[in-house]
Amino acid sequence: LGDVYKRQRYVHNDICFPAQIVIGEALAALESGKYDPDKVAIATGKYIGDCRLTHYAALLRKALDDAGYPQVPIITNDAEDAHNVHPGFKMNLKTAMQIAFGLPMIDALEELLRKIRPYELEPGSADAAFDKSIDAVIGGLRQGGIGGMKKGFKKAIASMLSVKYDRSKPRPTVLIVGEYLLNFHPGANRDMELYLENNGLEIIEARMTDVIRKTYFYQRSQQREYKVHRPLPTKLNNSISDAFFKLAHDATDKIAKAHPLYTPPCRMPELVQASDPIIHHTFDAGEGVLIPAEILHHAKRGCRAFVILQPFGCLPNHVVGRGISKRLKELYPDAQILPLDFDPDVSFANIENRLQMLIMNARKPRTS
């Protein structure tokens, strides 16, 4: 979090915590001296239009200009650039297809890592195999595009198969969901995953693929069910993108099933429609229905501990995170649902106290 504190002179401290993290880290990288500002670009995620995530590129542009890096371009994952703040790059179909194929593969490897690491017989072997696996997928992509990535993924699964483990005494499981930067950024969430694992739990994480795919799925559902008008090119793009994610899932499942611990994920249509009793599957604010959908999906499979990570003051995720807790408790009275708010000044002692209550309850023998 030092990057955030040191660079708050370029980002107002009332802006979203994820924005402070992203912009702070970008500036820290430039100030480190490792990169030539005249030969580097910064990539940042950007999607949906109901929260300040839409404005991260503009906030980053202002911070870079104020910090003395006006020449550094910004790359985002969409084609919108109304103010010409990041010229020189437009994501093409080939790049989008490679991303669509890569995400399910990374999700599969991370799932295997979380199922193996708490039970590994040789400390550090799971992390080492995972790092080797990621290198294999990236190397395959560089050498042979999507075909090369598939070959690299086969090598990755072989690496994960080489790790020895003993799952004869399974741990209680805990699902981590919430705003996706907090979910996947250990610096932002204070190494939440490692902390819970070190305290005797097995971690289940939401999938990054669903975070990206949901935009295309929602828009198609809104077009069909509510007759929302969108231009024909947008409709075609949504249909093609959603179909390509399905192909990517199919290819990933076909290769990953070689590992006995791999479980094919619940696909987007089935996953989100299961949340209809709480939030309709076409609702797309914040993380949309992914938070209740993931919780319901894993609750049906025996998980009873859930942590929802939220940036402080993030209204969309308060609605679909903390706001759904009461209804979920009605459906699963024995479930623990712990919403946690994060900002740069949050006390880890406060977070730890609340986590310890969840950990102690999760580790209690469950009564039938």
Ranges and model annotations:
Residues 2-368:
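An N-terminal assembly and electron-transfer interface module characteristic of large anaerobic redox
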